[in-house]
């Protein structure tokens, strides 16, 4: 059987080649050493590749003391050349937790722990309130919680939200007749309508003393006494004192025309 040759070790970061050694030295501030003095060059490059890879991923700058190199697993510590002092850098930043902030009194604040959901007692766990919220007074029975819920409801109501760039639309006033309950949008129309119930005629003719409910009706009536008929029919030339009388007269002409056309067809 022939001798089996072991393959060369593969770097942890494949994109870093041996030519990047000078770049790694510039980044980490290492002294320039010829490559022939580094027998374990692959391990040296792989070690710095981990540091560079962590730097490119955007991990926070958390440093470990130099004594932490002794706690590194053997597979990784064997890659480090003991002749060079490497700067301290985080080996596994996703495992290391950030230091808790110390308050002014010198005490470390307790971590906020949320109780686990009890799947064995689903009904009880779903209905009970969060103890952290109850301690802060955010329960439904507390005054602060009820006021906040009330404010949220008023924010969502469309009546409280004015439209941007537009004035709120005014509601139309309604005038209701006290006799029959009929609705009107103008007070004048309601006044004239109520006179039909009360038979009130405040406008009286000075000549014949005839009374009218509306002022325009009295104006049309005065044309009779003046012999002036401003509304004239264009077909027969007959004059009328009121426009509504002329409109009724025109319907008679249209009916006569319809009768003539029907006789011709027969």
Swiss-Prot record:
Residues bearing PTM Asymmetric dimethylarginine: 116
Annotated organism of origin: Homo sapiens
Show the PROSITE patterns listed in the entry. ZINC_FINGER_C2H2_1 (PS00028), ZINC_FINGER_C2H2_2 (PS50157)
InterPro entries according to UniProt: C2H2-ZF_Transcription_Reg (IPR050717), Znf_C2H2_sf (IPR036236), Znf_C2H2_type (IPR013087)
Give the protein's function: Transcription factor that plays a role in the regulation of embryonic heart and urogenital development.
Its lineage reads: Eukaryota, Metazoa, Chordata, Craniata, Vertebrata
The UniProt gene name for this protein comes to OSR1
Could you tell me which SUPFAM superfamilies the record lists for this protein? beta-beta-alpha zinc fingers
What tissues is it present in? Expressed in adult colon, small intestine, prostate, testis, and fetal lung.
Where it sits in the cell: the answer is: Nucleus
Q: Does the keyword Transmembrane apply?
A: no
User: Where do the zinc-finger regions (C2H2-type) map?
Assistant: 175-197, 203-225, 231-253
* Protein name, UniProt field: Protein odd-skipped-related 1
């Amino acid at each position: 059987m022939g001798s089996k040759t072991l393959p060369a070790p593969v770097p942890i970061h494949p994109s870093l080649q041996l030519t990047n050694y000078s770049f790694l030295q510039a980044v980490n501030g290492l002294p320039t050493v010829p490559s022939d003095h580094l027998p374990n060059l692959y391990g040296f490059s792989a070690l710095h590749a981990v540091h560079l890879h962590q730097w490119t991923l955007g991990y926070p700058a958390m440093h470990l003391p130099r004594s932490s190199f002794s706690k590194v697993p053997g597979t990784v510590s064997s890659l480090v050349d003991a002749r060079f002092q490497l700067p301290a850098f985080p080996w596994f930043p996703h495992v290391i937790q950030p230091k808790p902030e110390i308050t002014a009194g010198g005490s470390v604040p307790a971590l906020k722990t949320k109780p686990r959901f009890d799947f064995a007692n689903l009904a009880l766990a779903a209905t009970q309130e969060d103890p952290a919220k109850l301690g802060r007074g955010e329960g439904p029975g507390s005054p602060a919680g009820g006021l906040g819920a009330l404010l949220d409801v008023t924010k969502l109501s469309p009546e409280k939200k004015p439209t941007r760039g537009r004035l709120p639309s005014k509601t139309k006033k309604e005038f209701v007749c006290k006799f029959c309950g009929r609705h009107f949008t103008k007070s004048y129309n309601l006044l004239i309508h109520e006179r039909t119930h009360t038979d009130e005629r405040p406008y009286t003719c000075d000549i014949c003393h005839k009374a009218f409910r509306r002022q325009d009706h009295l104006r049309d009536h005065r044309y009779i006494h003046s012999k002036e008929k401003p509304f004239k029919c264009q077909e027969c030339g007959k004059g009328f004192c009121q426009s509504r009388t002329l409109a009724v007269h025109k319907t008679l002409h249209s009916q006569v025309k319809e009768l003539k056309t029907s006789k011709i067809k027969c």
